[in-house]
Amino acid sequence: MDSQDPVPVPEIVWDLRKARSNLGKHKVSFEEAATALEDPLSTTKPDPDHSISESRFLTLGLSFRHRLVLVAHTDDSDEIRIISARLPTRSERYAYEDDNLQQI
């Protein structure tokens, strides 16, 4: 790869039925969740407790609606699949804010 070549960006995908269910249950659309994944200040950590067959991750990021959103997803080289999304708990919000204050 030439140093001038752009880095390929994985496509963000999801199941439409799961997206409708998630919106009803958590009031967060997967469209909004996808924008939280693009937050440059987002934090991502592995989520091994919720899957044995695939690597899952939890990303906490700010969405285009200026809401902090926790996104459960898989991440491979060519696509990111959103599994669920919700608003964070108080302690998750504090952790995000604390992590980003330390970067200033």
Enumerate the predicted regions with their spans.
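Ribonuclease/tRNase effector modules and their secretory precursors
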Residues: 1-104
